[in-house]
């Protein structure tokens, strides 16, 4: 039994690719046909590939590995945050800061600063500091929260990345590839599938399509974690 039906994929518009003039020939094997100047993704392949990605992520989660959800384009931001939080994984949905993986030590320092500012607010330090200084610290905290809030509690590199649109997130993809971190991704007809370990061919621009696939990846994490709990 597949984790998603053709009907669900059709209803969410996962089959709509990009205009034929904006395509990557490497995606040819995942394209079913062309309609009104738009490529239509072969959903039978999407079902099969999503099943493979689901199993891979489930296995990782069962082994206690962390998955980082990455999607900074508007259509992906909410799904990435909501689904990563639902399965208690890390996410980046505002902007990928260069070095988030390859220079993780620096990111760790910024995360520690983020925790330090939160602690200052909680333990009453802000109440005894000058108002101007508190305003400045609050601004600093808000900025850190915006860009690093989804990495709260992250102590080492993730076991895999789940990426929405590897073309848009090319820096994240390059960093993961450099470090040998596997990439699971929704790959549209204008992307290069060779950069991704687990390709899920489909529409990465429609909110409903992105939400559906992201939900399934979060489900696979939860199923993997549940397997661990049942084994215990």
From Swiss-Prot:
Record keywords, A-Z: Ribonucleoprotein, Ribosomal protein
Top-rank lineage group of the source organism: Bacteria
Taxonomic source organism: Natranaerobius thermophilus (strain ATCC BAA-1301 / DSM 18059 / JW/NM-WN-LF)
Family affiliation: Belongs to the universal ribosomal protein uS2 family.
One Gene Ontology cellular component: cytosolic small ribosomal subunit
One of the GO BP terms on file: translation
Protein name: Small ribosomal subunit protein uS2
Pfam families associated with the record: Ribosomal_S2
PROSITE patterns per record: RIBOSOMAL_S2_1 (PS00962), RIBOSOMAL_S2_2 (PS00963)
Molecular function terms from GO: structural constituent of ribosome
Taxonomic lineage of the native organism: Bacteria, Bacillati, Bacillota, Clostridia, Natranaerobiales
InterPro entries noted in UniProt: Ribosomal_uS2, Ribosomal_uS2_bac/mit/plastid, Ribosomal_uS2_CS, Ribosomal_uS2_flav_dom_sf
CDD domains: RPS2
Keyword Protein transport recorded: no
Gene: rpsB
């Amino acid at each position: 039994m597949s984790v998603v039906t053709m009907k669900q994929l059709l209803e969410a518009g996962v089959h709509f690719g990009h205009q034929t003039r904006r395509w990557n020939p490497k995606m040819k094997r995942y394209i079913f046909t062309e309609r009104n100047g738009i490529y239509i993704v072969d959903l039978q392949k999407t079902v099969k590939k999503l099943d493979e990605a689901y199993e891979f992520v489930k296995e990782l989660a069962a082994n206690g590995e962390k998955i980082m959800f990455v999607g900074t384009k508007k259509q992906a931001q909410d799904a990435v945050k909501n689904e990563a939080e639902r399965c208690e994984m890390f996410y980046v949905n505002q902007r990928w800061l260069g070095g988030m993986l390859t220079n993780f030590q620096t990111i760790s320092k910024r995360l520690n600063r983020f925790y330090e500012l939160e602690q200052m607010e909680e333990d009453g330090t802000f109440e005894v500091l000058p108002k101007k200084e508190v305003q400045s610290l609050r601004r600093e905290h808000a900025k850190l929260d915006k860009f690093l809030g989804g990495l709260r509690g992250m102590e080492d590199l993730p076991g895999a990345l789940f990426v929405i649109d590897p073309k848009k997130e090319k820096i994240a993809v390059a960093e993961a590839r450099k470090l040998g971190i596997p990439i699971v991704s929704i790959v549209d007809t204008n992307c290069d599938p060779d950069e991704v370990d687990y390709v899920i061919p489909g529409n990465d621009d429609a909110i409903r399509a992105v939400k559906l696939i992201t939900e399934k990846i979060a489900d696979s994490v939860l199923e993997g974690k549940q397997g661990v709990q049942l084994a215990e």
